[in-house]
């Protein structure tokens, strides 16, 4: 052991203890283990708790030892001695006798805890430390337990297996009120599900007492548990989840858990379907997830299939465009599983991708009739088909041409089906060599024949006027079966335009089509039937939505770009456009996505005023598209909102929102750089950062939970040190005065010097600070390379740090403290209201 350590610890000489900090870290590194063992002997003595001299010596030595370990990165070498001293603290009293008064051994435990558990990513250290850390959860003071819980939560991220053996102890601590440890349970559940399952009902009972982040971690635990397909867990958690589904904060997360359960235990949700319908009406944006639950329950048996289909069909007619795809998928999946529900009409109904309202009407009508007609459908079909053949043959003498056409259509359908499963099958067909007159003839003849084909296929007995109407309607339906734009959707078992864009109405939509004499079919039609059908299928009349079509062709690129840009530029939670004297500005509001316990922006917002609103609107549009599995249309609610914002900023004669988004979908690189530069100038990145783990922008505290315990202690300095303050009493004299500043609580304090020229030592109140920023580079000279300014309502302060790195540290800490002050004020207002 180093001679100075031997002197200080052997003789307990407090006067020499301070000299330990004059020694180089490398000089004493080999002595640290022996010094720790000597400290253990001193702290275990009978009179230690009453001997102030011994306590002071031990505290100074531990501070010097932990500093040397950190600087030399030798934690693994000295871990056993550290843990041994830490463990010895458990043999003594750790609970304070008075308020805010730690016992001597609690102080030792706290110092060693931060040294050990900050190395939560080092396995050898954590193997030794975790068993002792769990013991402290039940023996330590409230503050010690809270800090321990923070460190164990970090350890669970990378070393969950080390905590798994202590799951029972962790649960016991949670049930005793240490809810912070709930974040550990999802990580250890895979290793030790049984203890958690045994106490699941008790954990769920805590929900109403928990804070928002703790509730989130409890729901994460249920999601992990649901994936294990344990029947006992399902029975316990489904009623709980349904009860909490009306909470808009969590209903999206809860529905994802219910979808997981519906995948393997659909009957568990059957009795709750009426309640799910009510919630879907209250929160329409949940329709897509609700559809998946109803789709899963609908696969149980035919009775439940009919019940679920009625709900899904009603939603198909009422919901906005983005939900049509998932609704159709679930409807088709159920009708495929129980083919008797729709019978032979299923194929033609689902072909009609150009009108979801009509699909819903047809499905509803068929659901009403199918139950009553199911017993006699076969007989009715056999009788009606010959009658219809005779009736139609009298009107359609050119049956030979019709038969040839059907062969061509079937061949083309087979070809499209084959190509739709092959990568790169988006080949375009054209009829450039055919005249307009021939095209009209082709389209007319094709439509007639497809209408005839549909009536023959359906074979339902109807009156003549009904035949005419249905023939016209189904002629346009059939085209969607060979819609080439649907080839990229591999999940669909049927060919349909899942995006719901109505196709061009052919001449078959007119009721008189069947009674019109067929024109002679040109020879070119026989050679180019595929190209003409494809051209007709991709030429909308009713749905002239260029934005939708553009996004459909570039959806994968748009989503990939949106995901990438979201890491560089944050997406505002709210945006308003305000008129100024010169132009329009965008007022943007940013909040933290996690909203943790110490969140800087859970109740308040970071507000940014931008002189460039259009790039922000463009970024928000791309973000909106990334949230939906299907292309957005100009009629979508979110797009309409962004369009309204765009129009407020639009110059006379400039491109409309739809044109701008189609011609220049992605913002210019220089525009993005300007957005980032502006965010830097307003110090946004001091208080926000992108979390790769969460995939979202979070505030400084939520991104760095390990710092929360230090930052949030009242009176504890957030940062302190020397700064030079510019004296501006006489502006023609450039003079700097050095003071020792401390940023703590809600104030920036400094000590008044002896000179009469020194300002009063009145603190700078953070509540009065309007903004903080670095001195702009264009204003910097040799005297201001690392300066920053603080603006209050009555004064401007200019400070200079020792270097640029130190200036950045001060700026970030001041901005964090400012955000905390505003958040605290916002919470107080909320509480008062």
UniProtKB/Swiss-Prot annotation:
Expressed in which tissues: Specifically expressed in kidney and eye. In the eye, expressed in retinal pigmented epithelium but not in the neural retina.
InterPro entries for the chain: ARM-type_fold, Melted-like, PH-like_dom_sf, PH_domain
Keywords carried by this UniProt record: Cell membrane, Membrane
Residue span of region Interaction with TGFBR1: 201-319, 663-833
GO annotations of cellular component type: plasma membrane
Gene Ontology biological-process annotations: negative regulation of SMAD protein signal transduction; negative regulation of transforming growth factor beta receptor signaling pathway
SMART domains given in the database record: PH
Disrupted-gene phenotype: No visible phenotype.
Domain of life: Eukaryota
Annotated ranges, domain PH: 716-819
Compartment(s) where it occurs, according to its Swiss-Prot or TrEMBL record: Cell membrane
Mode of membrane association: Peripheral membrane protein
Function recorded in the entry: Interacts with TGF-beta receptor type-1 (TGFBR1) and inhibits dissociation of activated SMAD2 from TGFBR1, impeding its nuclear accumulation and resulting in impaired TGF-beta signaling. May also affect FOXO, Hippo and Wnt signaling.
Subunit structure: Interacts with TGFBR1.
Similarity comment: family membership: Belongs to the MELT/VEPH family.
Free-text domain note: The PH domain is required for membrane targeting.
Name by which UniProt lists this protein: Ventricular zone-expressed PH domain-containing protein 1
């Amino acid at each position: 052991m180093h001679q100075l350590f031997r002197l200080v610890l052997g003789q307990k000489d407090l006067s020499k203890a301070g000299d330990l900090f004059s020694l180089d870290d490398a000089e004493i590194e080999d002595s640290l283990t022996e010094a720790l063992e000597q400290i253990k002997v001193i702290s275990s003595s009978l009179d230690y708790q009453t001997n102030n001299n011994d306590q002071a010596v031990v505290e100074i030595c531990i501070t010097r030892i932990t500093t040397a370990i950190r600087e030399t990165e030798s934690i693994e070498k000295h871990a056993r001695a550290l843990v041994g001293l830490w463990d010895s603290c458990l043999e003594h009293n750790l609970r304070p006798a008075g308020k805010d008064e730690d016992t001597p051994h609690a102080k030792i435990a706290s110092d060693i805890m931060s040294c050990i558990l900050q190395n939560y990513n080092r396995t050898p250290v954590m193997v030794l430390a975790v068993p002792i850390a769990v013991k402290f959860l039940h023996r330590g003071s409230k503050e010690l337990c809270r800090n321990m819980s923070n460190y164990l939560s970090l350890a669970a991220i990378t070393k969950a297996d080390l905590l798994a053996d202590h799951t029972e102890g962790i649960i016991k601590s949670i049930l005793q009120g240490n809810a912070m440890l709930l974040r550990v349970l999802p990580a250890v559940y895979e290793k030790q599900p049984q203890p958690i399952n045994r106490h699941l009902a008790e954990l769920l009972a805590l929900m109403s007492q928990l804070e928002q982040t703790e509730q989130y971690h409890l729901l994460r635990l249920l999601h992990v548990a649901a994936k294990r397909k344990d029947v006992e867990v399902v029975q316990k958690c489904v009623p709980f989840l349904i009860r909490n589904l009306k909470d808009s904060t969590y209903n999206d997360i809860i529905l994802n858990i219910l979808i997981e359960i519906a995948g393997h235990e659909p009957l568990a949700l059957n009795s709750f379907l009426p309640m799910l319908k009510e919630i879907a009406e209250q929160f329409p944006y949940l329709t897509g997830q609700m559809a998946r639950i109803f789709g899963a329950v609908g696969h149980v048996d035919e009775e439940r299939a009919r019940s679920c289909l009625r709900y899904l069909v009603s939603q198909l007619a009422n919901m906005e465009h983005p939900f049509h795809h998932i609704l159709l998928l679930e409807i088709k999946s159920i009708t495929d599983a129980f083919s008797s529900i729709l019978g032979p009409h299923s194929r033609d109904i689902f072909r009609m991708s150009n009108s979801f309202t009509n699909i819903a009407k047809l499905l509803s009508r068929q659901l009403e009739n199918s139950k009553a007609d199911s017993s006699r459908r076969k007989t009715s079909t056999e009788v009606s088909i010959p009658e219809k053949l005779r009736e139609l043959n009298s009107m359609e003498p050119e049956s030979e041409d019709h038969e040839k056409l059907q062969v061509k259509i079937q061949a083309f359908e087979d070809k499209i089906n084959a190509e739709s499963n092959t990568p790169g099958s988006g080949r375009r067909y054209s009829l450039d060599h055919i005249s307009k007159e021939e095209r009209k003839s082709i389209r007319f003849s094709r439509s007639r024949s497809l209408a005839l084909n549909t009536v023959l296929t359906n074979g339902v007995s109807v009156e003549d006027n009904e035949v005419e109407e249905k023939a016209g309607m189904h002629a346009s339906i059939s085209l969607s079966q060979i819609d080439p734009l649907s080839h990229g959707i591999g999940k669909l078992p049927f060919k349909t335009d899942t995006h719901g864009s109505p196709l061009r109405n052919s001449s078959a939509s007119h009721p008189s089509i069947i009674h019109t004499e067929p024109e002679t079919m040109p020879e070119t039609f026989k050679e180019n039937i595929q190209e003409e059908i494809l051209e007709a299928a991709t030429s909308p009349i009713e749905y002239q939505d260029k934005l939708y079509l553009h996004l459909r062709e570039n959806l994968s690129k748009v989503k990939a770009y949106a995901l990438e840009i979201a890491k560089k530029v944050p997406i505002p939670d709210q945006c308003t456009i305000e008129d100024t004297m010169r132009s329009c500005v965008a007022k943007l509001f940013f909040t933290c996505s996690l909203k943790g316990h110490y969140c800087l922006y859970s109740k308040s917002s970071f507000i940014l005023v931008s002189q460039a609103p259009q790039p922000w609107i463009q970024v928000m549009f791309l973000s909106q598209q990334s949230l939906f599995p299907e292309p957005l249309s100009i009629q979508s609610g979110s797009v309409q909102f962004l369009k309204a914002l765009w129009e407020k900023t639009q110059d006379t004669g400039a491109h409309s929102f739809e044109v701008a988004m189609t011609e220049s979908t992605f913002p210019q690189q220089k525009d993005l750089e300007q957005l980032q530069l502006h965010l830097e100038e307003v110090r946004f990145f001091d208080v926000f950062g992108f979390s790769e783990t969460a995939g979202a922008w979070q505030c400084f505290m939520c991104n760095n939970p390990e710092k929360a315990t230090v930052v949030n202690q009242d009176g504890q300095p957030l940062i302190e040190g020397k700064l030079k303050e510019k004296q501006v009493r006489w502006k023609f004299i450039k003079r700097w005065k050095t003071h020792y500043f401390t940023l703590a609580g809600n104030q920036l304090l400094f000590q008044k010097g002896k000179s009469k020229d020194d300002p009063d030592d009145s603190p700078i109140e953070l509540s009065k600070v309007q903004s903080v920023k670095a001195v702009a580079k264009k204003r910097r000279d040799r005297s201001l390379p690392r300066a920053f300014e603080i603006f209050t309502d009555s004064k401007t302060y200019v400070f200079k740090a020792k270097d640029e790195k130190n200036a950045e540290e001060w700026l970030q800490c001041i901005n964090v403290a400012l955000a905390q002050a505003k958040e605290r004020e916002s919470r107080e207002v909320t509480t008062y209201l």
